[in-house]
């Protein structure tokens, strides 16, 4: 599904990361972790073919950017303006209009053949139901909560039946219940639809129970493995090149700190 072999990204003359090797299969859920500036979003852009990368970056056996019709993408975002009156269902329909990233111009449905229009409507309704958004999909998007908006954006990314789903900070700015709900949704889509998922996350806590592996980026390189193997004092000390401690609190959440007293600003929940 996704293959990186000795991949290297250079942005503005700086090597962001190099020698990355990763293979992601159908139905696998991977989180990409690391400090700010470590190249997490750059990795997703390289997979999309939006950032040049050396080495091998392939999706569905094709060079990055050649198989984007098979890729769903949810970029970083801010909440929609409360005054925005476009409906959630219309936001989802944008996912059918073109294979380019960003906000495409919606197709004018009255110009389409009736059969095609009916098929579009059926697929949009199907994917809205898949993400559990049927109850509010016809509301203005600005009236929806953050979690509801994110479900609709995930539906937009899934409407073309992608084989690979890329999510950039999909839980950012959501409240804790919404984070839990969206995390469970992503896992359900991954398993039931056999979609490979690569998700950039600043806080792995909400998705930790669902992950197959994590890729932790720092200092231009990465360590890859199960959460239990990677989020450890030993593994992260080797990665950062300094002494790092992974601390667990009374409810099982993990905090990663360097010594003597400089926090690395990562909080994780251990996977037991």
Predicted regions and their residues:
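Conserved ABC ATPase "signature" region
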Residues: 106-136
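Conserved ABC transporter NBD signature motif
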Residues: 52-69
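Conserved ABC ATPase signature
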Residues: 140-144, 148
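Conserved catalytic motifs of ABC-family nucleotide-binding domains
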Residues: 161
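Catalytic Walker B motif of ABC-type/P-loop ATPase nucleotide-binding domains
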Residues: 165-169
């Amino acid at each position: 599904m996704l293959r990186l072999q000795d991949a290297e990204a250079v942005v503005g003359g700086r090597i962001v990361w190099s020698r990355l090797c990763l293979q992601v299969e159908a139905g696998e859920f991977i989180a990409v972790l690391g400090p700010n500036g470590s190249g997490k979003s750059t990795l997703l852009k390289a997979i999309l073919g939006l950032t040049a990368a050396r080495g091998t970056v392939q999706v569905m056996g094709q060079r990055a950017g050649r198989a984007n019709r098979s890729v769903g993408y949810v970029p970083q975002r801010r909440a929609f303006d409360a005054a925005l009156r476009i409906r959630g269902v219309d936001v989802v329909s944008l996912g059918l209009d073109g294979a380019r990233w960003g906000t495409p111009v919606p197709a004018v449905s009255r110009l389409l053949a009736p059969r095609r229009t009916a098929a579009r409507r059926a697929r949009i309704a199907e994917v809205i139901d898949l993400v559990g958004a049927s109850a509010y999909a016809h509301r203005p998007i600005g009236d929806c909560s953050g979690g509801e908006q994110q479900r609709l954006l995930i539906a937009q990314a899934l409407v073309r039946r992608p084989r690979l789903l890329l999510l950039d900070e999909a839980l950012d700015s959501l409240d804790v219940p919404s984070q839990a709900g969206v995390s469970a949704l992503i896992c359900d889509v991954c398993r039931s639809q056999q979609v490979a998922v690569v998700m950039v996350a600043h806080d792995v806590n909400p998705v930790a129970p669902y992950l197959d592996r994590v890729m932790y980026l720092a200092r231009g390189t990465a360590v890859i493995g199960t959460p239990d193997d990677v989020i450890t004092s030993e593994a992260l000390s080797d990665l950062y090149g300094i002494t790092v401690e992974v601390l667990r609190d009374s409810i099982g959440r993990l905090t990663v700190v360097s010594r003597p007293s400089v926090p690395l600003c990562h909080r994780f929940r251990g996977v037991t």
